[in-house]
UniProtKB/Swiss-Prot annotation:
Expressed by the venom duct. This is Conotoxin Em11.5. GO terms for cellular component: extracellular region. Residues 1-26 form the signal peptide. It is found in: Secreted. The cysteine framework is XI (C-C-CC-CC-C-C).
Amino acid sequence: MMFRLTSVGCFLLVIACLNLFQVVLTRRCFPLGTFCSRYLPCCSGMCCSGWCTRRCAPRFGKRATFQE
């Protein structure tokens, strides 16, 4: 009887630990200077072009010109 209770208790403890690890791993965030995305957020700062930074720099590039 004691063996059965111990086995069940151990089994329930393993299930609880696996659930805890799942929550921790799915809600983790990434520090500055690492890769980020919509589903992998930054801990602090913003996700700019796939990288965690404090602020997003303005994007410079070619602008379309209207031709008449």
